[in-house]
Amino acid sequence: MRPLTDEETKAMFEKLSKYIGENIKLLVDRPDGTYCFRLHNDRVYYVSERILKLATNIARDKLVSLGTCFGKFTKTHKFRLHVTALDYLAPYAKYKVWVKPGAEQSFLYGNHVLKSGLGRITENTSQYQGVVVYSMADIPLGFGVAAKSTQECRKLDPMAIVVFHQADVGEYIRHEDTLT
């Protein structure tokens, strides 16, 4: 487990800023302690420094996971967020989308959000902006990328895609063997 390089940190923070903006600093400087990001097997983990010090006694090849996995770097060195980061992204999300109860299941199966399933959307959401998807009961379901801006959504036909699917809580079941 090692600290991220400058290039890796930049790629990860650019991806996180699409979803939570300048609230990234709230992830690192928390009132309950200092947290940091560490890389292990191409996966980025979010862990408190107190637990990180305890993990130094474990051999690197024996360590499977530590803290919360925020995402991983692909072979082309792009950062991809995992659904395990949802609990940390949702409270700080700048742009949100609420889906109707009938569209929740479709989203949780890995499909995009259609206009017919859109309940609400945050004002001034621009196209290709990172959004957190909520149920109408304000339960975070996953995250995605806005396919259309808020103004364009008002004029769309019901079968048009509004949010491109990125990750959802259904992945805990669909990919339980590969999530760490």
Curated annotation (Swiss-Prot):
Pfam families: pre-PUA_NIP7 (PF17833), UPF0113 (PF03657). Residues 93-180 are annotated as: C-terminal domain. GO terms for molecular function: RNA binding. Its main location: nucleus. It is found in: Nucleus, Nucleolus. One of its GO terms (cellular component) is nucleolus. Residues 1-92 are annotated as: N-terminal domain. Keywords: Nucleus, Ribosome biogenesis, RNA-binding. One of its GO terms (biological process) is ribosome assembly. SUPFAM superfamilies: Pre-PUA domain (SSF88802), PUA domain-like (SSF88697). Monomer. Interacts with pre-ribosome complex. May bind to RNA. Interacts with NOL8. Interacts with FTSJ3. This is 60S ribosome subunit biogenesis protein NIP7 homolog. It comes from Xenopus tropicalis.
